[in-house]
Amino acid sequence: MVKVGIVGGTGYTGVELLRLLAQHPQAEVVVITSRSEAGMPVADMYPNLRGHYDGLAFSVPDVKTLGACDVVFFATPHGVAHALAGELLAAGTKVIDLSADFRLQDPVEWAKWYGQPHGAPQLLEDAVYGLPEVNREQIRNARLIAVPGCYPTATQLGFLPLLEAGIADNTRLIADCKSGVSGAGRGLNIGSLYSEANESFKAYAVKGHRHLPEITQGLRRAAGGDIGLTFVPHLVPMIRGIHSTLYATVADRSVDLQALFEKRYADEPFVDVMPAGSHPETRSVRGANVCRIAVHRPQGGDLVVVLSVIDNLVKGASGQAVQNMNILFGLDERAGLSHAGMMP
């Protein structure tokens, strides 16, 4: 049984970790921390978890207690894992970070986008980017895993087959992405209020979003060189979900794109390439650790449109974190993650 600690258990990704791990056959949450809610039973804060964590209460983060775990998840704002990860790694504890603290390999670039100096640049060499569909073998031997963001997960998985095959114009990629309001987190945010977000639809951060350098970093690796990406995120009035509409130019019209995508993801348990002509919906992945993809070539032209949907809290965060844990400890990659999407 893998002994699990969670730092930051009161946000959406933290409670989603609890929900998924409650049904995991080979993992047990033994520590969960929250400075603001220390002493409160988990089941009191989250009644949906009654009967699963009745003996577990939030506690103040303590390195000695966390260091006794096999793995610690950080479901915290950026900067928190910088302060604690080094001590936990020194204690022999594996670290899986759901924040952005170790996603970017360049600490200067990280500081530019997150508005503060990188707090643990010495750990970046140890950090493995936790996109299993790309880095599965590195994840197996990792000490520190950086779980990808939600937009980067949907966007990279959609573009990867085209870039790896070298058939796209890498200088003119477009990612037109939509997210539900849970992507903004559980804290007070005027733009996420029901009366502000409901019956409305808007773009934001067009000048530059924090996920842009992460997406660019991953696509460069896939392409083996520089890429040009325009990334425009939007907020839509739903709770969960990411829908990425991706555009790339592919001059060779003889390429069987459906076959290309099906072959690339044939052995991936959490990527579903839908039949030709499909239009995946966010509701089909709600609550599931699945990225559902469809590829189109409208009017048989040279513009390719890829549709990629995920649940931002599952495959875009906590589910992918558990998937990484399964790989890291040699477990069945599907363990605790077999849930179908919730419909309606």
Swiss-Prot record:
Organism superkingdom: Bacteria
Involved pathway(s): Amino-acid biosynthesis; L-arginine biosynthesis; N(2)-acetyl-L-ornithine from L-glutamate: step 3/4
Localization per record: Cytoplasm
Gene Ontology biological-process annotations: L-arginine biosynthetic process
SUPFAM superfamilies: Glyceraldehyde-3-phosphate dehydrogenase-like, C-terminal domain, NAD(P)-binding Rossmann-fold domains
UniProt GO cellular component terms: cytoplasm
Top EC category: oxidoreductase
Any Pfam family matching the protein: Semialdhyde_dh
Primary location recorded for the protein, binned into one broad class: cytoplasm
Job of this protein: Catalyzes the NADPH-dependent reduction of N-acetyl-5-glutamyl phosphate to yield N-acetyl-L-glutamate 5-semialdehyde.
Family the UniProt entry places it in: Belongs to the NAGSA dehydrogenase family. Type 1 subfamily.
HAMAP family associated with the record: ArgC_type1
Protein name according to UniProt: N-acetyl-gamma-glutamyl-phosphate reductase
Naturally occurring in which organism (per UniProt): Pseudomonas syringae pv. syringae (strain B728a)
